[in-house]
């Protein structure tokens, strides 16, 4: 043991350094928040709960191209479609198994009409696994509920896409 180490051990140098660090941060603003009542701002690129969007006239955006189903690495998306009278296709079944989803965002990137998006909601805890099997009605209701925030996030992210 060197003389310097011996002096530091007798003077409790580590103890002084620890208390100095505590005092330094004691007078700074807090870094934590009171979570349920205060929330940090989310990035426009945040990937949360899935939603199906509609056009302003109320028609579903999804054209049943099934690109999102094909690109999903977790195989969490299931789509069934049928043609309409005007020759276009629309989905009859659009299911997402949220227990399989890895929130990679590939479905959102692959969609040519921005129909499937990952919205800003991250608080969707459930009591059963069955509640995490989202059908078309649940996805459309998510889209209706979060449309304003989703549109703002897509607009903010548009220069980078």
UniProtKB/Swiss-Prot annotation:
Record has Iron as a keyword: yes
PROSITE patterns on file: 4FE4S_FER_1, 4FE4S_FER_2
Binding site for [4Fe-4S] cluster 2: 72, 101, 104, 107
GO molecular function, one term: iron ion binding
Keywords: 4Fe-4S, Cell inner membrane, Cell membrane, Iron, Iron-sulfur, Membrane, Metal-binding, NAD, Quinone, Repeat, Translocase, Ubiquinone
GO cellular component, one term: plasma membrane
Cofactor(s) essential for the protein: [4Fe-4S] cluster
Enzyme class name: translocase
Annotated positions binding [4Fe-4S] cluster 1: 62, 65, 68, 111
UniProt name for this protein: NADH-quinone oxidoreductase subunit I
Native organism: Novosphingobium aromaticivorans (strain ATCC 700278 / DSM 12444 / CCUG 56034 / CIP 105152 / NBRC 16084 / F199)
């Amino acid at each position: 043991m060197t003389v310097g180490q011996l002096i530091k051990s007798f003077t409790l140098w580590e103890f002084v350094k620890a208390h100095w660090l505590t005092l330094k941060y004691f007078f700074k603003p807090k870094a934590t928040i009171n979570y349920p009542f205060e929330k940090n701002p989310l990035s426009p690129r945040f990937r949360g709960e899935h939603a199906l969007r509609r056009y302003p006239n109320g028609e579903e955006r999804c054209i049943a191209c099934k690109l999102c189903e094909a690109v999903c690495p977790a195989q969490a998306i299931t789509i069934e479609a049928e043609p309409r009278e005007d020759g276009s296709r629309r989905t009859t079944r659009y299911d997402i198994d949220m227990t399989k989803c890895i929130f990679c965002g590939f479905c959102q990137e692959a969609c040519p009409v921005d129909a499937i998006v990952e919205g800003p909601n991250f608080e969707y805890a459930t009591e059963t696994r069955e509640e995490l099997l989202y059908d078309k009605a649940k996805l459309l209701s998510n889209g209706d509920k979060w449309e304003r925030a989703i549109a703002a996030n897509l607009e903010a992210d548009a220069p980078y896409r």
